[in-house]
C-alpha cells in the first residue's frame, strides 16, 4: 500500500457488468439491470484512487433507510395516484425516480445483502448468500431456443454492425465516447479508439451477429450496442466454451426506455443459437454471485498531470517536487535481452502463457492464433515485450494494453493515457524486475498511469513498486456455472 509520502491516486472505476437477461438465454459482461438508470458499464476503472496515507473521501451522501424490499426502478413502484392532481402526480413520480437512482448499484457485499435482485433471481446463477461446494452448470443446455429477435420499443430496430465499414466503426466509437463509462464524479470517460474496438471485438472466432446494434428507424442513428466474443475458459478442472459480453451501451436519452434489458436478452438468444450456454463477465458492482473479487491498483507515471486533473492529489506533508521525485523511474529498462515481441516469438509466448496459467483456477485457454491476436504489438493498443537470453531463448514476457480516458471540463488536459497490465509470465527474470521494466517502458511511451489488478501474482510487486490501492473492486462472475469462490490470487483472467 501507499504510505503517507505518496500521492493518493484516483483509481479507474472497475468494470461494471453487462448482464444476461431473459429466461436463462444469455451471456454477458454484466450490467446492473436492477438499476436501469445507472446504465454505465465499466471495464477498467475510472475513478480516482485512495491510498492509505491520504485522508479518505467522505461519502457523498449517507444512504437513506429503506422500508421493505428495494425495487428495480421507479416504474416498478406501485403508487395510487388516481385522485391526485396532475402536478402532484409528476412531483411524486420525480421523487420516486430520484430515490431509485440515488440508491445506485451495490458496491460491497454488505450493500448487496440488503438488496433484492428480481432480475438475477430468474437467472441460472447462485444466490448471493449461497455456499457453493459443487462444480457444474446451474441448468442444462437448452434445446428449444427462440428463433425470432426480441421486440424493441416502437421506433427502434436491430442492426448487426459491420465493423469492417469505417463509417459504422466510427458510429460505434462515437456512441461509446459520448455515452459509455464515466467515473462517479463525471470527471473521466473511457475513450476506446476505433482500432482498439477492432482488437477487442474481432478476435479469432468472432461472429458478425454478435455485434448487436440498435438504431432509430427514422434517422438510422445508432443508439445502443452490446457485443459477445468467444472464449475457451478453464475453471478449476473443467474447460468450457463460453463468451465474454462487453460494451453494453445505451444512449443517455434512451435510458428510460428499458432498452438495455432487451439488448441483453437478444445477445443471450444469439449466443445460445451458437450452442454456447456459459459466460464469464466482470462488474464493478456486486451481483449474485461473484466467483472472485479483485481490486485495481494505480502507479503514477506522470504525477504532476494526474494531480492537475484531480486523478490524484498530494498527500499530506508532500510537495509537488517531492512527489515527482518519489515516482521517478530509470530512463531505460534494466533487464538484459528485453525487446518487443516479434512474429517469430508467437509459438514460445503461447507455450509460456499456457504453462504459466496452469497454477490458477480461472484462466483463458488460448490457441496460437488467439495469442497472436491478443499479444502481437499494435501501437496504442497492445504492447508485449519478451526477454531473450544469451542463448537466444525467450524466457519471460510482459504485456499491457492502452485505454485512454477523456478528461472532461479541464482547461488544459484533454486525455489521460492509461496502461493496463495484461499477462506477465516469468521463468528466469524475477517478476518484480519484469514489472519495474514495464513501468519504465510505459513511461517512455508517454503513459500517465499504469493500472493493475491484484490477481495472479500481482500482489507480490504492487506495494514495492509504489502502486496506490484503488477505491473499487472488480467482481468476476460466471453465468450458468456453479463453483466455489476463489481469492484474487487464483484468478488468471484479464478482460479488456
Swiss-Prot record:
UniProt-annotated location(s): Cytoplasm; Cytoplasm, Cytosol; Membrane
An annotated GO BP: ketone metabolic process
Pfam families linked to this entry: NMT, NMT_C
Membrane topology: Peripheral membrane protein
Reaction catalysed by this enzyme: N-terminal glycyl-[protein] + tetradecanoyl-CoA = N-tetradecanoylglycyl-[protein] + CoA + H(+); N-terminal glycyl-L-lysyl-[protein] + tetradecanoyl-CoA = N-terminal glycyl-(N(6)-tetradecanoyl)-L-lysyl-[protein] + CoA + H(+)
Main location: cytoplasm
Effect of mutating residue 192 to A: Reduced glycine N-myristoyltransferase activity
Family of the protein in this entry: Belongs to the NMT family.
Protein name per the record: Glycylpeptide N-tetradecanoyltransferase 1
Species whose genome carries this gene: Homo sapiens
Amino acid at each position: 500500500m501507499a504510505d503517507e509520502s505518496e500521492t493518493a491516486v484516483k483509481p479507474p472505476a472497475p468494470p461494471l457488468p453487462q448482464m444476461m437477461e431473459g429466461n436463462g438465454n444469455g451471456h454477458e459482461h454484466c450490467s446492473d439491470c436492477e438499476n436501469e438508470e445507472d446504465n454505465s458499464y465499466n471495464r477498467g476503472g475510472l475513478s480516482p484512487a485512495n491510498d492509505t496515507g491520504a485522508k479518505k473521501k467522505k461519502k457523498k451522501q449517507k444512504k437513506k433507510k429503506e422500508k421493505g424490499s428495494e425495487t428495480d426502478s421507479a416504474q416498478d413502484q406501485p403508487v395510487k395516484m388516481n385522485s391526485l392532481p396532475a402536478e402532484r402526480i409528476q412531483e411524486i413520480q420525480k421523487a420516486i425516480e430520484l430515490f431509485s437512482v440515488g440508491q445506485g448499484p451495490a458496491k460491497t457485499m454488505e450493500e448487496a445483502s440488503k438488496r433484492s435482485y428480481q432480475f438475477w433471481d430468474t437467472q441460472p446463477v447462485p444466490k448471493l448468500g449461497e455456499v457453493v461446494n459443487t462444480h457444474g452448470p446451474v441448468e442444462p443446455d437448452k434445446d428449444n431456443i427462440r428463433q425470432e429477435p426480441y421486440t424493441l420499443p416502437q421506433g427502434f430496430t436491430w442492426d448487426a454492425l459491420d465493423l469492417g465499414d469505417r463509417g459504422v466503426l466510427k458510429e460505434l466509437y462515437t456512441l461509446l465516447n459520448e455515452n459509455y463509462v464515466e467515473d462517479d464524479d463525471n470527471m473521466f470517460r473511457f475513450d476506446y479508439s476505433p482500432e482498439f474496438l477492432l482488437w477487442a471485438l474481432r478476435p479469432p472466432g468472432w461472429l458478425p451477429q454478435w455485434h448487436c446494434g440498435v438504431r432509430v428507424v427514422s434517422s438510422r442513428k445508432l443508439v445502443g450496442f452490446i457485443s459477445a466474443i468467444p472464449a475457451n475458459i478453464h475453471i478449476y478442472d473443467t474447460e468450457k466454451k463460453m463468451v465474454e459480453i462487453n460494451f453494453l451501451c445505451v444512449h443517455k436519452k434512451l435510458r428510460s426506455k428499458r432498452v438495455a434489458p432487451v439488448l441483453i436478452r437478444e445477445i443471450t438468444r444469439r449466443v445460445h443459437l451458437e450452442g454456447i450456454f456459459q459466460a464469464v463477465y466482470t462488474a464493478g458492482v456486486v451481483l449474485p454471485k461473484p466467483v472472485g473479487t479483485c481490486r485495481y491498483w494505480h502507479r503514477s507515471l506522470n504525477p504532476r498531470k494526474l494531480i492537475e486533473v484531480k486523478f490524484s492529489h498530494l498527500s499530506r506533508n508532500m510537495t509537488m517536487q517531492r512527489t515527482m521525485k518519489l515516482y521517478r523511474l530509470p530512463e531505460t529498462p534494466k533487464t538484459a535481452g528485453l525487446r518487443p515481441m516479434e512474429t517469430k516469438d508467437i509459438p514460445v509466448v503461447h507455450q509460456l502463457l499456457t504453462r504459466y496459467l496452469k497454477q490458477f483456477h480461472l484462466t483463458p485457454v488460448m490457441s496460437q492464433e488467439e495469442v497472436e491476436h491478443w499479444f502481437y504489438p499494435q501501437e496504442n493498443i497492445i504492447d508485449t515485450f519478451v526477454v531473450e537470453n544469451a542463448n537466444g531463448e525467450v524466457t519471460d514476457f510482459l504485456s499491457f494494453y492502452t485505454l485512454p480516458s477523456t478528461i472532461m471540463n479541464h482547461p488544459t488536459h484533454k486525455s489521460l493515457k492509461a496502461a493496463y497490465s495484461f499477462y506477465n509470465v516469468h521463468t528466469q527474470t524475477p517478476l518484480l524486475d519484469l514489472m519495474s521494466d514495464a513501468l519504465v517502458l510505459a513511461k517512455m511511451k508517454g503513459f500517465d498511469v499504469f493500472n493493475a489488478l491484484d490477481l495472479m501474482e500481482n500482489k507480490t510487486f504492487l506495494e514495492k513498486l509504489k502502486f496506490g490501492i484503488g477505491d473499487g473492486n472488480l467482481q468476476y462472475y460466471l453465468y450458468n456455472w456453479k463453483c466455489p469462490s476463489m481469492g484474487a490470487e487464483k484468478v488468471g483472467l484479464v478482460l479488456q
